[in-house]
Design a protein with these regions (language model features):
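C-terminal lobe/tail of nucleotide-utilizing enzymes
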Residues: 2, 212-294
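Walker A (P-loop) phosphate-binding motif
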Residues: 2-32
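Ferredoxin-like iron-sulfur electron-transfer modules
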Residues: 27-33, 54-77, 88-106
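Short beta-strand-centered segment that lines the nucleotide-binding/catalytic pocket of NTP-utilizing
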Residues: 35-50, 123-128
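Switch II (G3) loop of P-loop NTPases
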Residues: 42-43, 141-150, 157-184
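Conserved nucleotide-binding/hydrolysis micro-motifs of P-loop NTPases
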Residues: 44-46, 179, 201-203, 229-232, ...
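Iron-sulfur cluster-binding cysteine motifs and their immediate structural context
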Residues: 80-98, 109-125
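Inter-motif core of Ras-like GTPase G domains
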Residues: 181-202, 208
Length: 294
């Protein structure tokens, strides 16, 4: 059954605004011209891949996490639960136990180890998942509830939904959150290959180096795509050479590409060089994963 699992390609970046979603949406649409593909927007705090596709909604569901609810009638104020919680989601304040849902990681320790069952777990909505279809392209996005602070659980449950429903799709594209924090690690953790998108500027190079450190710590095979090539210098190119990082493509800086993007349109159909870059990127990912290269 292993060979039925999709090739998972995560597209990430050290900072926002580098073109991560541009690459994700265009690569997914390019693949969908020939094969079934699922594009998953894991930037759950600000998903926007859906702006580029007008698809049929095929599934929608709310996502919940479990949090403890204090039962005052059972509680003996023994003080065990605050000591158990590493995240300080449960505290004792005088004659009361206070639960902070936004800090809770749903580990169940306080509930399971309470000697009088005074902290039963209850569901709390953290976001919503939607699944669309556009021809051979399936698009899944999750959106974090306003006021929620933890994206990791929602990202994890979104990936599980994809595993449960798209195990036979040949390729899955994960549009990851920007940066190098916990949500990025969760989004890329199961990826077979990670594409890091950067821009040829000092700021882009700085954040790329942080993303490279993260991927190496996770022991993920990865390569770099330089977007808006031509706006700055070649320091990013030199960095990739010095660090022996595969440079997968250089997408040119273009006013026309920016205009298409701002109108919610894909760009590869109008730019043969971009379409060729997408083909090269895909070939490299497939060859690297199948060949077992790091």
């Amino acid at each position: 059954m292993t060979d039925l699992k999709p090739l998972k390609i995560a597209i990430a970046s050290g900072k926002g605004g580098t073109g991560k979603t541009t690459l994700s949406t265009n690569l997914a649409a390019f693949i969908a011209e020939q094969n079934e593909v699922v594009l998953v927007d894991l930037d759950v705090e600000e998903p926007n891949s859906g702006l580029f596709f007008k698809g049929e909604l095929t599934h929608e569901e709310d996502i919940f996490k479990m949090i403890p609810q204090w039962d005052e009638s059972k509680c003996t104020l023994c003080g065990i639960c605050p000591k158990l919680c590493s995240y300080h989601a449960v505290i004792q304040l005088g004659p009361s136990i206070i639960v902070f849902p936004e800090l809770c990681h749903s580990c169940y320790a306080c509930s399971e180890l309470c000697p009088v069952d005074a902290l039963p777990m209850i569901p709390k909505k953290t976001g919503a998942l939607r699944d669309f279809r556009v021809g051979k392209l399936h698009f899944v996005e999750s959106r974090l509830e306003i006021g929620e602070e933890q994206a990791v659980q929602l990202i994890s449950k979104t990936k599980k939904y994809v595993d449960d429903n798209y195990g036979k799709v040949s390729i899955a594209i994960f549009d990851s959150p920007p940066g190098t924090s916990c949500p990025v690690m969760e989004a890329t953790r199961d990826a077979d290959f990670v594409i890091l998108v950067t821009e040829p500027t000092p700021f882009g190079l700085h954040d790329l180096s942080l993303a490279v450190e993260t991927m190496r710590a996770l022991q993920k095979p990865f390569g770099v795509v330089v977007n808006r090539y031509g706006i700055g210098n070649d320091e990013v190119i030199h960095y990739c050479r010095e660090e022996n990082i595969p440079l997968l493509a250089k997408i040119p800086n273009s006013r026309k590409i920016a205009e298409l993007y701002s109108s919610g349109k894909l760009t590869y159909q109008d730019f043969p060089e971009v379409k060729q870059s997408l083909s090269d990127i895909l070939d490299y990912c497939i060859t690297t994963v199948k060949g077992g290269a790091a």
